[in-house]
Design a protein with these regions (language model features):
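Aromatic- and acidic-residue-enriched carbohydrate-binding clefts of CAZyme catalytic domains
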Residues: 1, 53-85, 128-168, 203-225
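Extended, charge-enriched "interface" segments that sit outside catalytic cores
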Residues: 1-87
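Short, solvent-exposed loop/turn segments at secondary-structure junctions
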Residues: 51-53, 66, 117-121, 198-201, ...
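Conserved, well-ordered alpha-helix/loop/beta-strand core segments that scaffold catalytic motifs
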Residues: 87, 92-119
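Active-site neighborhood of glycoside hydrolase catalytic domains
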Residues: 101-103, 179-193, 197-248
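Aromatic-lined carbohydrate-binding surfaces of glycoside hydrolases
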Residues: 116-134, 186, 198-200, 219
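Conserved active-site carboxylates
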Residues: 170-175
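Conserved small/polar residues in nucleotide/adenosyl-binding loops
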Residues: 253-260
Length: 264
């Protein structure tokens, strides 16, 4: 298969498929849109706007859209309604096929592990729709970003660049963003593997304008308080925690539970 050719032409082909799809829309599509509306509506709008801005990051969009002003959002939903439908259709088809694959595996005794990174990209619908949950300044630019300090393998450390969570804000609403995230992941996968688990105990914060990770500082994370809050709402989840890197005594003491396992 010529994957490069497919990558370059996939959306043109999928847009042709969209015309046929909406000539006879299955009832399951509307049910999917209603069930997944809490994330699907924002995601589809976000992708439609990125397409309209030639792939530019949301932080570079015009101010009314960047700051999600109500009038601008309402106008965008109307202007890009057709493109929004396109992205919703893609998600419906993906989830339909994914569920078929997962069911096929489960029926044969195979469980699927899903890798979930602790951080999300700055140019993501998560940050665009929830800016108060991240360390951003008044212009919605990252104040501090994620990474790892210098070590024997890298004199400059690792500058990942992901915006950091406002754990204080997340604590105030009972970690609802994380609860929603893990709830969705638990439907996609049989087991969730959380990458960079030690970041929940303490995390490395690098000034947002820096070009290396040399000037970062360590800060305390929410610890197991986050997972206790999630468990109260979702019950026990089957989680694998990464044990790669230096694990603090606090992390080693608090992390084990009957359904937790470690996997590097």
């Amino acid at each position: 298969m010529d994957y490069a050719l497919l990558y370059e032409n996939r959306y043109d082909l999928l847009r042709k498929a969209k015309v046929r799809f909406f000539e006879n829309v299955p009832q399951e599509y509307w049910q999917f849109c209603e069930k997944e509306a809490d994330w699907l509506d924002d995601f589809a709008l976000f992708m439609a706007l990125k397409e309209a801005h030639n792939g530019a990051q949301w932080s570079e969009w015009e101010r009314p859209l960047k700051f999600r002003e109500a009038e601008a959002i309402a106008k965008a939903k109307d202007t890009y309604a057709d493109e929004i439908d396109f992205w919703k259709m893609l998600q419906y088809l993906f989830f339909e096929q994914w569920c078929e694959l997962k069911n096929y595996a489960n029926e044969r005794g195979i469980r699927i592990i899903g890798d979930v990174p602790i951080y999300v990209a700055g140019d993501s619908v998560d940050v665009w729709t929830n800016p108060s949950q991240f360390y951003l300044d008044e212009n919605l630019e990252p104040i501090d970003v994620a990474g790892c300090p210098p070590d024997a393998f890298s004199a400059d450390g690792q500058l990942w660049g992901n915006p950091l969570f406002r754990w204080d804000v997340m604590r105030e609403d009972g970690y609802s963003w994380w609860t929603m995230r893990l709830r969705k992941m638990s439907t996609l996968y049989d087991v969730i593997r959380i990458d960079h688990f030690r970041g929940f105990d303490s995390y490395y914060a690098i000034p947002g304008k820096d070009t290396t990770a040399r000037n970062g500082v360590w800060r305390n994370g929410p610890g197991m308080e986050l997972f206790r809050a999630v468990e109260e709402k979702l019950g026990k989840l089957d989680i694998i925690v990464e044990d790669l890197g230096f694990l603090t005594p606090c992390l080693l003491y608090t992390s084990p539970s009957p359904r937790d396992r470690s996997l590097s």
